[in-house]
Amino acid sequence: MDMKITFPGGKQVNAEYNGFVHKTDQPLAAGGGNTAPSPFDLFLAALGTCVGFYVLSFCQQRGIDMAGIELRQAMDRDPQTHLIGRIDIEIVLPASFPEKYRAAVVQAAQLCMVKKHLENPPKFNLFTTIR
């Protein structure tokens, strides 16, 4: 699994992976052009969309209509470290959602691989090479 990181200009940094180019930029206040999400915004979106995928798959496998289902993700920053200390993901279900599946849809959402990697982080190795 290799990803190529490129620098197209300004504060933009792109990731080329699996046939896609994931573009990032910084907000205007940080000197960027605000032409794409920031890397941290993509990180948070990856978590939410991953959990959303598992909720979607759960419902599709059971023929449950997705109308009225949405996720809300809220992040709380630690005032001392300025890092996110807690992430709450609320699965909003319509009144028509089958009661017997309420706990099970949460269990399905727990399977998200992005969430699992945050709970069990990999080791990082940053280094340089000269070409």
List the model feature ranges, each with a label.
Residues 47-51:
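Alpha-helical metal-binding/catalytic segments enriched in His/Glu/Asp
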